[in-house]
A protein has these predicted regions:
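Charged regulatory segments coupled to nucleotide-binding catalytic modules in large multidomain enzymes
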Residues: 58-196
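Glycine/threonine-rich ATP-lid/beta-loop region of ATP-binding domains
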Residues: 1-107
Length: 196
């Protein structure tokens, strides 16, 4: 839960030093209780000097949505540096990691976790989005690919369209359809690492 909240609310937690989330707990087996801080968890990328499969890049562009609304989109991506991400937090927050020193949920080098996070309306709405955005099939070549798509309303609206529960971008919206079309172009496709 701590890692999930640290991923979903990473921008909120890092905007102002007074923004905090704590998880209070009580262990019913031994009566111990305590409080754990939620730490913002951002992706970090392998330097382009190291010739990663997907070089680090950042782009921004505008997309039109329903009823003529305009959105500013920022797309950051690259090859994730899992070692840098864990070593930065391991000493102060060892409970965030498995005994092998990896994150427990979002940032793991496997097929189900590859892809980008979608930021809109003040938080991460979707994580590990891959096949819905890119014209590719998940396979081990993309295990280290990651990034973030940030969507900001610019004209004609104050919010990004979401589903009824407000927990994900409305994938039936014109905004989403246009975003998928743009990110499926060769310019934005991730590069995979072949394991021979």
């Amino acid at each position: 839960l701590r890692e999930l909240l640290g991923v979903k609310f990473r921008r909120l937690l890092s905007v102002h030093p007074e923004n905090e989330i704590y998880i209070d707990y009580e262990d019913e087996t031994n009566g111990k209780s305590g409080s754990l801080p939620v730490i913002p968890i951002f992706p970090q990328y392998v330097s382009n000097d190291q010739d990663p499969p997907t070089p680090y890049a950042e782009d921004s562009f505008e997309i039109e949505g329903d009823d003529g609304a305009v959105y500013e989109v920022e797309f950051e991506r690259g090859t994730l540096d899992f070692d840098a991400m864990t070593s930065e937090l391991a000493d102060d927050y060892p409970g965030l990691f498995t005994t092998s020193g990896r994150f427990r949920t979002r940032f793991r080098p496997n097929q189900s976790k590859q892809g980008v996070d979608i930021y809109a309306n003040g938080r991460i709405l979707m994580t590990s989005v891959f096949t819905d955005l890119f014209d590719l099939i998940r396979n081990n070549e993309y295990n280290y690919f990651g990034g973030e798509v940030r969507i900001f309303p610019k004209e004609g609206t104050t919010e990004v369209p979401t589903d009824n529960k407000k927990v994900r971008v409305d994938t039936n919206s014109t905004l989403w359809q246009n975003l998928c079309e743009i990110l499926s172009s060769d310019e934005y496709q991730p590069e995979g690492k072949r394991y021979d």
